[in-house]
Amino acid sequence: ETGIMVARGDMGVEIPAEDVPHYQKEIIKKCNATYKPVITATQMLDSMIRNPRPTRAEVTDVANAIYDGTDVVMLSGETANGKYPLEALKMMVKIAERTEQDIKGRSADIAKVHSKRSISSAVCNATVQTADNLNAKAIVCPTISGFTARLTSKLKPNAEIIGCSPYDNVLRKMQIYWGVRPLKTATETSTDKIIEHALVVSEQAGYVEEGDTVIVLSLIHI
């Protein structure tokens, strides 16, 4: 599995600066259409290398990348050699959390793009719509490869996505999927045990509790 990084600083060296916003949006759009993870990076809060507060243009830039559907917004120089690394991180979190309040509820529109692409995407689409209709607290995805969590992530559900896997490399991959909370589970031999343990660790981690509505999405062959 591969992902794409939209490194605007490097792109600005290779193409005219005025073309960078167009290609950023196109790359994010194509990654979302093909379920590829996409990271938007470089010069996002660049002024915070020197100043404790960003410019309003930088705040808007970060928010627009999230509105466009990027999985990750990433700091670079701001935390690598800036004077205000913690402040930059906190500001990035605040922007993301505020912007995602507007994204919530858009899953029905986003899902229409994906629902006819494959059996797997159709199943994920139906699951997200069910979770939204039931106001579910979480969608629990037991997964061997991270594929189920990745597909569900691109549909931007209102519910938390909990990606459960026994494999560390899969858990690391799921860290960059939008809205996915990776949790490690034990290796089980039956589908029933896999699902049961996924629910147990989700509750132990505090993502769900007794009485919550939870949807379990598993593309594991039964």
Language model feature labels by segment:
Residues 1, 70-71, 136:
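A structural motif
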Residues 210-211, 216-217:
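C-terminal binding/interaction regions
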Residues 1-42, 48-59:
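Conserved alpha/beta-domain cores
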Residues 6-13, 62-84:
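Glycine-rich phosphate-binding active-site loops on the catalytic face of alpha/beta enzymes
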Residues 148-150, 156-193:
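Nucleotide-binding motor/catalytic cores of P-loop/tubulin-like NTPases across gene-expression machines
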Residues 220-222:
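Conserved small/polar residues in nucleotide/adenosyl-binding loops
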Residues 91-128:
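Long, charged amphipathic helices and adjacent flexible linkers at domain junctions
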